[in-house]
Regions:
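A cross-family phosphate/adenosyl-ligand binding-site feature
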Residues: 1-124, 129-404
């Protein structure tokens, strides 16, 4: 997906060993459809060469205010006026301090100072040693630069080049890309508190066996990311899946349907939008064996008695907050056939304003899907596309249905 198509990003590099990550970040920005103009400080050029960044960006790299290639000798004006955003990655402690002080004695800081502040946003990806990050001076400067209008993207935690471990690592290139895409996304869910369920549940039979399904959780995780990009505060209740948590999303891991119900009920009181994408098991064994059930040589299968699991969506949809309109509920239906008929019937049975249907066996575990939206007005198809693209479309569809 060319999610940054038409965007012109000025990528600034200040001095730090994390400059090596900027090379991959540059490539990912371009792959997402952006054009990238690289500007480097003298210190950055000690960690990675302008030749490398020029080869990756396909554009001449700027490093000096006194660049004869600019006819008017004003690269700080020319480059900043062309930008849709300026992203400093890595952004050193020194460079943050320079921004706070309004220093303008080299091209990159001068360009940040000269940018039209109401039109060209400034995004900072800090990178430094953990002690430098935690120092009161750095924290003061971060607060001030944010107050001055910059967006601080945060840092990672982990091993650092110095051999220490802690906060201060620059975010990974994929995380930075996710943040940039989120920054430009329309904030159609601003102010909403969104609760999402995703993935399968696992209903244990004995310590080594259980009942589950083929849901991968990919659709729910994609919706969580899209909702966060749309400005929502997102909590994701995830069944047993091995997927990375989207940036900025709070995740609660659960196993069984009962675990999921407890987590959802614990979060629903503060939510304004509930999206139930999880494929919750309909049944569980009445009594879980504490030991592995073994064959007894008779050839007869063990007798298993089943009880129905709680209907999480219906229970939330029937809650006082949902009935009053304070909590908007969206359900999902994974069917094997007769999708429209089953989805329409399920919407009425669950008591939700919007039901999203899909053919489960064809899409479980896949990266693409097609969706059918069913509400009281009728139905609408979202044609086959990546789950990422469908999640963005679905978030927009939900946003326009929310009570104002």
């Amino acid at each position: 997906m060319n999610e940054l198509a038409g965007k012109h990003i000025v990528l600034g590099l200040s001095g730090g060993v994390a400059c090596y990550k900027a090379a991959d970040f540059c490539r990912q920005l371009i792959k997402a459809g952006a054009t990238v103009q690289v500007v480097m400080t003298e210190a950055a050029e000690r960690f990675i060469t302008p030749v490398t960044m020029q080869a990756l960006s396909g554009r001449t790299v700027y490093g000096s205010q006194w660049d004869a290639r600019e006819p008017n000798n004003m690269p700080h004006i020319n480059l900043s006026r062309e930008a849709d955003a300026i992203v400093i990655a890595p952004c050193s402690a020194d460079f943050i301090a320079r921004l706070v002080q309004g220093r303008a004695d080299e091209l990159l800081s001068l360009m940040c100072l000269a940018r039209p502040i109401d039109r060209v946003p400034l995004l900072l990806a800090p990178a430094m040693n953990r002690e430098m990050w935690a120092h009161p001076a750095t924290q003061r400067n971060l607060a001030q630069v944010a107050q001055d209008g910059a967006t601080v993207l945060g840092v990672g935690n982990g091993d650092q080049a110095c051999g220490e471990t802690g906060d201060g690592r620059m975010l990974e290139p994929s995380e930075l890309l996710e943040e940039v895409i989120a920054f430009f996304a329309p904030k159609v869910l601003a102010g909403q508190k969104v609760l999402i369920t995703a993935g399968p549940t696992f209903e244990a039979i004995d310590p080594v066996r259980g009942i589950t399904n083929l849901s991968s959780g990919k659709m729910g995780f994609a919706i969580a990311r899209a909702a966060r990009e749309a400005g929502a505060d997102v909590t994701l209740v995830a069944g047993p899946v091995h997927l990375p948590t989207p940036r900025g999303v709070r995740r609660l891991d659960v196993k069984s349907a009962q675990n999921m119900l407890e987590a959802v009920e614990g979060q629903a009181q503060g939510a304004t939008l509930f999206i139930a994408t999880a494929a919750v098991a309909d049944w569980r064994v009445a009594s879980q064996s504490t030991e592995k059930i073994k064959k007894d040589g008779s050839g007869q299968p063990p007798a298993l008695n089943f009880v129905e699991n709680p209907d999480i969506l219906a229970r939330v949809a029937q809650s006082p907050r949902a009935q009053s309109g304070a909590l908007y509920c969206v359900g999902f239906a994974a069917e094997s056939h007769d999708l429209l008929a089953h989805a329409a019937a399920k919407r009425l049975r669950k008591g939700v304003p919007l039901l999203v249907g899909n053919i489960g066996p064809a899409t479980f575990g896949q990266d693409d899907n097609a969706l059918l939206l069913v509400d009281e007005q009728g139905h609408r198809e979202l044609p086959h596309a990546s789950k990422r693209a469908l999640a963005q479309q679905l978030v927009a569809e939900i946003a326009r249905r929310l009570p104002r």
